[in-house]
Amino acid sequence: MSGHSGHDVKYGRHRTRRSFARISEVLELPNLIEIQTASYQWFLDEGLREMFRDISPIEDFAGNLSLEFIDYDLGEPKYSVEESKNRDANYAAPLRVKLRLINKETGEVKDQEVFMGDFPLMTEMGTFIINGAERVIVSQLVRSPGVYFNGKLDKNGKKGFGSTVIPNRGAWLEYETDAKDVVHVRIDRTRKLPVTVLLRALGFGSDQEIIDLIGDNDYLRNTLEKDNTDNAEKALLEIYERLRPGEPPTVDNARSLLVSRFFDPKRYDLASVGRYKINKKLHLKNRLFNQTLAETLVDPETGEIIASKGDILDRRNLDQIIPNLENGVGFRTLRPTDGVMEDSVLVQSIKIYAPNDEEKEINIIGNAYIEENVKHITPSDIISSISYFFNLLHGVGDTDDIDHLGNRRLRSVGELLQNQFRIGLSRMERVVRERMSIQDMTTITPQQLINIRPVVASIKEFFGSSQLSQFMDQTNPLGELTHKRRLSALGPGGLTRERAGYEVRDVHYSHYGRMCPIETPEGPNIGLINSLSSFAKVNKFGFIETPYRRVDPETNRVTDKIDYLTADEEDNYVVAQANSKLDEQGTFTEEEVMARFRSENLAVEKERIDYMDVSPKQVVSVATACIPFLENDDSNRALMGANMQRQAVPLMHPEAPFVGTGMEHVSAKDSGAAVTAKHDGIVEHVEAREIWVRRVSLVDGKEVTGGIDKYTLRKFVRSNQGTCYNQRPNVAEGDRVVKGEILGNGPSMDSGELALGRNVLVAFMTWDGYNYEDAIIMSERLVKDDVYTSIHIEEFESEARDTKLGPEEMTRDIPNVGEDALRDLDERGIIRVGAEVKDNDLLVGKVTPKGVTELTAEERLLHAIFGEKAREVRDTSLRVPHGGGGIVLDVKIFTREAGDELPPGVNQLVRVYIVQKRKIHEGDKMAGRHGNKGVISRILPEEDMPFMPDGTPVDIMLNPLGVPSRMNIGQVLELHLGMAARALGIHVATPVFDGANEEDVWSTVEEAGMARDAKTVLYDGRSGEAFDNRISVGVMYMIKLAHMVDDKLHARSTGPYSLVTQQPLGGKAQFGGQRFGEMEVWALEAYGAAYTLQEILTIKSDDVVGRVKTYEAIVKGESVPEPGVPESFKVLIKELQSLGMDVKMLSADEEEIEMRDMDDDDFTNQNDAFNIVQPENAAAEKTE
C-alpha cells in the first residue's frame, strides 16, 4: 500500500485534495439551507392562501353582510437588503389583499384592494432583516397531532393503558384504565367519565348497542357498571356538567357544546398531518397483521369469499385482501339515535380471536378511510380509537413511543408564520364582525371594515419577541449555517427545560440520518436543541426524511434509485450500512451484511436487505462532518469539537486545513457568506468591492453573450457578534465561471473553502509545567506574523432627544472639557473617521439641558441687568467604554431633516464604528477540531521554543496528558497526516467514517520521507540540548475562539452602587465590583485578618459616609478614618421592623442608639462624590 493510497478530488476552482474515501458518493448533498427557503416559499405560495380560505367568508351576526378574501399579492420591498440594514428597517414587502363585500339584502357587490401591512421577506440566505438586524427563525420539533397509545404501570405494579387524541388546536380526548379495570375518558383535561358515557352521547344509548358495537368483554362490563347514565340524553347532560360546571344543563346546549368542541372545523383542527396520522394508526391493515380471523370475509359486491374463519393474516394474505378492505369489506353503517350527530356513521369492523385468549372474539373497528380534507375529528374516529384501546387490553395493537421521530414533526418558518398570522386574522375577524353590525350597510366598504392592526402586531410580535426568532449567530459562516439548520424542542407549544426529562433528550434510533446524535449544546439545553443531519429533508407533513438506495427485490442488487423515508416508513425495512462491500453490478459481496432494523443492529443474509445508506456522513450534521477522524474520537469530545468550530473568530489571514473532510467547500458555498455566481459567464472586471460577470448562454449550440451581472462585495462590515465580515474576490479577469461557483470568499474562507483557523506546527510535550491543565504554550512568531490576528468592529450610538426641559444638542461646546479632548471632533462635535481613540475618549459631544434651579439674589440682579442667565447644561456625551479603544472606521448620521425614520422624540442619531485589531494574547482560548480546548498560558520568544533537527522552532506546545483520558485520538492522527501533507505540499480529505485508516496515514508518512514512528528529536531552545525522548510533532489545525481575554478583563476602583443596599453592582456590563462572598470571608477569618475584613465589608462596600471620607483621605494623603455602619445593616433593621418586630440597637453601655445618630451630620453632598444608580437603572442590580 505504500505511496499511492487516495485519489485526487477537485473542490471548486482553486483546490484539489487527495481523498481517502473508499465509498463513492451516489447522491450530492442537498442545498443546506433548503429547510428555511423551501418552507418560506411554501408559505408565500400556499400557506397564506390557505389562511385566507379558512377565514373567508366573514359574515355578520344577522347574516346580511359577507366579506370574502379573493386574492392577495406581495409588492416590491421598500428597501433593498443592504439599505434595510443601514436604516434599521425591516426588509419587507407590502401585502395587498383583494376583498369582496356582498350585501345579501340588496345583492350589491363591492370589490376593493386593501393594504394589510408590510410582510417581512426572507433573504436568499434564509434570514430575515428585522430592525436592521439579521434574524433566523429556528424550526421547532413538536409532538405530531394524532392518536397515541401508551402503556403505564400503576402503584401496585398493575399494567394499564392510556391514550390521547392530540389535535393541532382544540380539545384533547384522553382514555385511561384504572385499578378496577374501568375505562375512563377525559374531555379537555376535565374530570374523568366512564368511556361509555361518551359513546352514549354519540347516539349509542343502550348498553346493548354499546356491547354490539365494541364487542362483549370484562372491561366494557365493568365500565357499564360504573356508568350511571342509561341513554343518550342523560349522557349529554353528564358531559355538559363536567365541561361547564355550575351552569344549568340542557340537552340542546350539551349537544351544541360537543359539536363545537369536536366537530367544528374552526374550533378543532387536526391539520393534514393529524388526519394522515389518525388514518394510518386506525387503519385495519396494520391492526390485522398476524391475527386470526373469527369470521369469514365476503366481498359485498361479488359475494366471493376473500378469507375464511380461522385464517392467520400474515404479510402475504394481508397484502392480498388490502384492496378488498379498501373497497368496503366489513363496512357497517351505524345509525345513532338522539346523539350529537344526526347523520349515520360509517365504520369498518372485523372480528378476530384475541391473541391472549383463543376462545374470545374481539371486534376491530377502523374509521373507514376518512377523506384527507376532513380536518376535524369524526364520530367514526372516536369509535375506532375507543375500539383500538379495548383491543390493546386484549393484546392487539402497539403502543407508541413518543420520542420516535415518526411521532415528532418539524414546524418550520412557513408554518410558524402561518400560525402567527392566523392569530392576527382571527383577532381581525372579531373586529370586522363588530364593525359590520355598527356601520351603515349602504355606504360601507371593505376598507372601513378591515382593521389591520392586530395582523401587523402579531407578525411584529413573532419576529421581535418569539423564542424561535433568534438573533443570527454570525461569528463565522459555519455558525450561520448551523443556526439555520437548528431544530429546537423549546418554544411556544413545545417543551420547557425544567419539564423535559431524560428520555426526550436522549439519542433515539430513529434519529439516524435525520438528526445529528453529536451536535447539541452542553448545559441545560442538551438534547433539546439539535441539528439536522447533512442529507435530511423535510416532507410536506413536517416529518424528517433521510435518503436510502433501493435494493431491487428480484435481483438483490443495490440500484441508484434513491428513496426518501420517514422514520415511520423506515421501521418496516432492513437497511444496510453505507460501507457494505458491493461488486460492480451492485450485489453484496458478503453473505452476511451488517444492517439495522428498528433499534437492532444485526448481521443479516443479503437477500433480506431492502435498502442501503447513501453515505457514511448521512448520520451527522454539517459541523460534525467537518471533523476529520471523527471515528477515532470519543463522542463527548466530538460534541465539543462541533460546537467550538462555530465559535471560531474569522482571522485576518485564514488558511484552509491541510487535513480536511471535503465538507469545507459545500458548507462555505451554502452558508450564504460567500459571493456565488447567479449565471454562467466570463469575469470581465474584478476589484475589491465589485465583480462584473458577462453572462454567457448556449443557444442552438452557439455561445451567446448577454448582459452584465454586477456583484457587490461587503467590506469590513460588523457582524451580529462584532466580528469583521469581509469578502474578497476569488476569481481573476477572464475566468469562465459556472452558476453557483464561488466568486468571492467571505469571512473565514480560503479559496472557496471554510477556513476557521490556521495550520500550525504542534509538539505534544510539557515545558516547565506551563501547559498544566490543558494550557497552551505558544511561540511569539504567531503574534509577530499576525497568524492569529482578528479584526473586531464595535458599534456605539448616541441619540439627541427632546426632553421636558428642551432638546438635547450635539455640539463641540461641552462644559468643563479641555481643547485637548476635543481635538478629533469636527464642528458638529462628532469624531472624525480614522481617529485613534482610547478608553473614555469623546466620540460624540452632546449636552442636555439641566433643571432650572432657584436663582440667588445676585443672579437675579445680574439677570435683570443683562437679561441672560448662564446656560444650564450637563455633559451627556458618548465616550469610549473600558476596553473599547481602537480606530474609528465609520460614522453614520441620521437626522429628522434628512428624512430618516427615527423613533419618536429622537432628533438626531449618530452611530460610530470602532475597529480593533486583536493579536493573540495570553488568556485567549484556542481549540482544535476534536474538542481539545485550552487557554494560552505563555507566549515564548521564538528562540526559547524547542526546535527540530533542521532548526525549525515549533509553534505550539500541547500537554500530552490531554489525550489519553479524553480519548480523542483523532487529533494525533491529524497531527501525523498533517505533517505528511505539508511535506508533500498537498491537501487531503478524510471524510467522516470513511476516511484515512491507520495504514493510509503511515503510508502517507512514509511517502513524505518522515521517520517510521512519525516522531522527531527536539532540541531545547534555551540550552540547545536534545530532549530525552522522541516527541510527536506535526501540523494541527488550531482555531482561535470568540472567548477573548480583552472582552473579559475588568477592573474597578469606584463606580455605580445599588440604590437600596448601596453595595457596588456586579458584572463587567455594569462596571461592577468583585463579590467578596461568604467563603472568602471565612478565609480571612481563618487568618484572623480583622482589619482587612472590616475594610472590605464597610468602606470598600456599603458604608456610605466612610467610603467618601476614605476617598477624601487618600486624595489628601491623610490616614484612613474609622469605618462606620454598613448601609445593608440599616436595611436589615428596617426589614425586621417592617415585619412588626421591635428591633433596637444598643451600644456597649447598653444605651439605645438612634438610627439617625448613625449618620454623620457633616456628610451631605455624597451624590456628587459618587454616581449612585437612580431607580431607572435599578434593573442593573443583580441579586446574587
From Swiss-Prot:
Its EC number is 2.7.7.6. One of its GO terms (molecular function) is ribonucleoside binding. HAMAP family: RNApol_bact_RpoB. PANTHER family: DNA-DIRECTED RNA POLYMERASE I SUBUNIT 2. Belongs to the RNA polymerase beta chain family. The lineage of its organism: Bacteria, Bacillati, Bacillota, Bacilli, Bacillales. SUPFAM superfamilies: beta and beta-prime subunits of DNA dependent RNA-polymerase (SSF64484). One of its GO terms (cellular component) is DNA-directed RNA polymerase complex. This is DNA-directed RNA polymerase subunit beta. DNA-dependent RNA polymerase catalyzes the transcription of DNA into RNA using the four ribonucleoside triphosphates as substrates. The RNAP catalytic core consists of 2 alpha, 1 beta, 1 beta' and 1 omega subunit. When a sigma factor is associated with the core the holoenzyme is formed, which can initiate transcription. Pfam families: RNA_pol_Rpb2_1, RNA_pol_Rpb2_2, RNA_pol_Rpb2_3, RNA_pol_Rpb2_45, RNA_pol_Rpb2_6, RNA_pol_Rpb2_7. Residues 1160-1184 are annotated as: Disordered. One of its GO terms (biological process) is DNA-templated transcription.
